[in-house]
Swiss-Prot record:
Protein name, entry field: Fluoride-specific ion channel FluC 2
Activation/inhibition comment: Na(+) is not transported, but it plays an essential structural role and its presence is essential for fluoride channel function.
Sequence positions that bind Na(+): G72, S75
Listed transmembrane segments: 3-23, 38-58, 62-82, 94-114
Keyword field: Cell inner membrane, Cell membrane, Ion channel, Ion transport, Membrane, Metal-binding, Sodium, Transmembrane, Transmembrane helix, Transport
Signal sequence, renumbered to the chain: none
Keyword Cell membrane tagged: yes
PANTHER family, per database record: FLUORIDE EXPORT PROTEIN 1-RELATED
Role, per record: Fluoride-specific ion channel. Important for reducing fluoride concentration in the cell, thus reducing its toxicity.
Membership in a protein family: Belongs to the fluoride channel Fluc/FEX (TC 1.A.43) family.
Keyword Membrane on entry: yes
One of the GO BP terms on file: cellular detoxification of fluoride
Catalytic activity: fluoride(in) = fluoride(out)
Length: 123
C-alpha cells in the first residue's frame, strides 16, 4: 500500500473516532437496551455499511477511507466481545443471549435497510 492509502485510513479513522465519541457523549448514562452506545454505534455502522455497499464504491482510496478507516474505527466489535465475556464471567447467561441476539439481529437488519434504501432511492 502506498503512503496515500495510509493517509486515507488515518483521516477516515479519525472521523470515525470523533463520531463514535460524540455518540458516546450524547447517549450519556441512559441505557436504551443492555448497553447504550455500543449497540447504537454497531447498528449505525451496519446501516452505513449497507448504504455504502449499495452504492457499489469502486474507488480504492474511498474504500480505504470509508470501510477501513471510518467504519473500522467507528464500529465497536471488540467492545461487544468484551461485554459478552463480562456477562459470561458474571454468569448472566440470559442477558448474554438477549444482548448477543439484539446486536447481531439489529446490525443485520440495519445493514439490509441501508442497502435496500440505497438501491431504491439512489441507484
Amino acid at each position: 500500500m502506498e503512503l496515500d492509502g495510509f493517509i486515507y485510513i488515518l483521516v477516515g479513522s479519525t472521523f470515525g473516532l470523533i463520531v463514535r465519541m460524540f455518540i458516546k457523549y450524547i447517549s450519556g448514562k441512559k441505557k436504551i437496551f443492555y448497553s447504550n452506545n455500543i449497540l447504537i454505534v454497531n447498528v449505525l455502522a451496519s446501516l452505513f455499511l449497507g448504504i455504502f455497499e449499495g452504492l457499489n464504491i469502486t474507488n480504492k482510496n474511498l474504500i480505504l477511507f470509508i470501510f477501513v478507516g471510518f467504519l473500522g474505527c467507528f464500529s465497536t466489535f471488540s467492545s461487544f466481545i468484551y461485554q459478552l465475556f463480562n456477562l459470561i464471567r458474571e454468569k448472566k447467561y440470559l442477558i448474554l443471549l438477549i444482548y448477543y441476539a439484539e446486536v447481531i439481529l439489529l446490525s443485520f437488519l440495519f445493514f439490509c435497510l441501508g442497502y435496500f434504501i440505497t438501491l431504491t432511492f439512489i441507484n
